[in-house]
């Protein structure tokens, strides 16, 4: 399971600023 999630971490982390920007 983690072998599938780890490659996605950069995408998830990269999307965080966009989510924050959308909330503001």
From Swiss-Prot:
GO terms for biological process: defense response to bacterium; killing of cells of another organism. GO terms for molecular function: toxin activity. Keywords: Antibiotic, Antimicrobial, Cytolysis, Hemolysis, Secreted, Toxin. It comes from the Eukaryota. Expressed by the skin glands. One of its GO terms (cellular component) is extracellular region. It is found in: Secreted. Belongs to the grammistin family. Group 1 subfamily. Thanks to its abundant amphiphilic alpha-helices, it may integrate into membrane phospholipids, leading to lysis of the membrane. Its high hemolytic activity is inhibited by phospholipids, but not by cholesterol. Has antibacterial activity with a broad spectrum against various species of bacteria including both Gram-positive and Gram-negative groups. Also has high ichthyotoxic activity. Exists as aggregates of 3-4 molecules. This is Grammistin Gs G.
